[in-house]
């Protein structure tokens, strides 16, 4: 296609790429797209989009180009490793390799050369996502999806081994000649067969892992494969689990302690005795290809039957999500250094593909989160890893016992808030003004938030934060709570329903932005009137954690006015009931050493 320089051809290509990006565009095979030179011909890209102040300051992001799924995170010989899907040639999806970065603290990162690139027949047309497993001798092994037929998008599973296990940086990886080690036999859909998980070892000495797939037109499936040597694999007679949700990408399956401790559990460690099994629950997470979000269930793993059963029979229908915002293709790993489980997730851009090409970069990784089982046993709790607090400035701004009346907003001054960490505890004096929850929206937080956003006056709430706000409030991103009385059911009272929402509909004056509201119900008891919120603000991303990590929302925003020193922070209350900020603490966030100083 030799006419990329023409306006017509460029417009057509931008439309194609935008459609791919909005659909996720994570698993498509096409020829090389080298669009960097063509970026200068793009019309209609606002100057604010290419402003360097919109590039994140402390989130994981390479200096340029496209990234997506986090792959094979691990801790090895004193170093944290993160591999990730990366296009070395441009800011759109394509030419994917496994980029590789290492860190001592999960905050400051050094980029190494790509670890896995197309080089053998079994991955000639793509090296897609996968996971790492620590063998009994402590050596890591990577399993990943390869594409070896471009015409039908045929997917197989391959293995890669470190060339030198004594190298703590694992700078070189080799692919044995016996790849691929798993192929889609027995009626499996070869075009929907990918993303092998971390393996775990059973009492019988066999390793087991999952591969995500699609059965029929709509059934997501996690197939179980067994092996003694990571070379010869056999599929189990039945899947670990399946549900009518659409294709399951990037499955993740891991144990969590069920006895109230926040410690992680190594996936590869066998739990064989009944007493130990009683102290452990299992989490099965899947990334929904059609809906572009991650959901999980908590349940029981029957090792003899090779089956997983969610505790909630409706768990595959009423999805609990890691994050109700822009967060996908997640992967956890066990950190033996601090005995915790850490969650990584990809956040794509929400501007256009033309914008991404113009600015030269697309995609970030969310701040790593520690995850553990809530004492209720019903869901996970998530919290930014403690290391991120090292980036906080020395002197925080503190606001205490500040009453915010109905319709009032209060500016938080004394710091630059475009790159900040804000923790706030709210108190609601009375819940009597809470509105009745519409039964039609009792299971649809997103619809409820869209219908009644941050500016819609309510009873108890909306109250929360306006972040990345301009001086005249022409631009603002709202992160807030709203409290409802439960929908009437048989005359029972029930506990109040808490909605958490991020509303970016006024985040930018740029009319071309994708600015959806994001929302989730928070499973918390607010009858005492107390609830907390933490927001990590980083120029073009807002990551928020409600009620101690019971609900999380990540949103990408691109202000044109509220940039750098012009960004402001407010507490607001658009409800009828007054609220009190019992304490707000806000820190400016420093920039880490990211990707060799970028």
From Swiss-Prot:
<keyword id="KW-0964">Secreted</keyword>
<dbReference type="Pfam" id="PF00251">
    <property type="entry name" value="Glyco_hydro_32N"/>
</dbReference>
<dbReference type="GO" id="GO:0005975">
    <property type="term" value="P:carbohydrate metabolic process"/>
</dbReference>
<feature type="glycosylation site" description="N-linked (GlcNAc...) asparagine">
    <location>
        <position position="189"/>
    </location>
</feature>
<comment type="similarity">
    <text>Belongs to the glycosyl hydrolase 32 family.</text>
</comment>
<protein>
    <recommendedName>
        <fullName>Beta-fructofuranosidase, insoluble isoenzyme 2</fullName>
        <ecNumber>3.2.1.26</ecNumber>
    </recommendedName>
</protein>
<feature type="glycosylation site" description="N-linked (GlcNAc...) asparagine">
    <location>
        <position position="164"/>
    </location>
</feature>
<comment type="function">
    <text>Cell wall-associated invertase that cleaves sucrose into glucose and fructose and is required for assimilated carbon partitioning during early grain-filling. May be involved in sucrose unloaded in the ovular and stylar vascular tissues for the stimulation of starch synthesis in the developing endosperm during grain-filling. Sugar homeostasis mediated by CIN2/GIF1 plays an important role in constitutive and induced physical and chemical defense against pathogens.</text>
</comment>
<keyword id="KW-0732">Signal</keyword>
<keyword id="KW-0325">Glycoprotein</keyword>
<dbReference type="InterPro" id="IPR018053">
    <property type="entry name" value="Glyco_hydro_32_AS"/>
</dbReference>
<keyword id="KW-0134">Cell wall</keyword>
<dbReference type="InterPro" id="IPR013320">
    <property type="entry name" value="ConA-like_dom_sf"/>
</dbReference>
<feature type="glycosylation site" description="N-linked (GlcNAc...) asparagine">
    <location>
        <position position="348"/>
    </location>
</feature>
<feature type="signal peptide">
    <location>
        <begin position="1"/>
        <end position="25"/>
    </location>
</feature>
<dbReference type="GO" id="GO:0042742">
    <property type="term" value="P:defense response to bacterium"/>
</dbReference>
<dbReference type="InterPro" id="IPR013148">
    <property type="entry name" value="Glyco_hydro_32_N"/>
</dbReference>
<keyword id="KW-0119">Carbohydrate metabolism</keyword>
<dbReference type="GO" id="GO:0004564">
    <property type="term" value="F:beta-fructofuranosidase activity"/>
</dbReference>
<dbReference type="Pfam" id="PF08244">
    <property type="entry name" value="Glyco_hydro_32C"/>
</dbReference>
<dbReference type="InterPro" id="IPR050551">
    <property type="entry name" value="Fructan_Metab_Enzymes"/>
</dbReference>
<dbReference type="GO" id="GO:0050832">
    <property type="term" value="P:defense response to fungus"/>
</dbReference>
<dbReference type="InterPro" id="IPR013189">
    <property type="entry name" value="Glyco_hydro_32_C"/>
</dbReference>
<dbReference type="InterPro" id="IPR001362">
    <property type="entry name" value="Glyco_hydro_32"/>
</dbReference>
<keyword id="KW-0378">Hydrolase</keyword>
<keyword id="KW-0326">Glycosidase</keyword>
<feature type="active site">
    <location>
        <position position="69"/>
    </location>
</feature>
<dbReference type="GO" id="GO:0052576">
    <property type="term" value="P:carbohydrate storage"/>
</dbReference>
<dbReference type="GO" id="GO:0005576">
    <property type="term" value="C:extracellular region"/>
</dbReference>
<dbReference type="InterPro" id="IPR023296">
    <property type="entry name" value="Glyco_hydro_beta-prop_sf"/>
</dbReference>
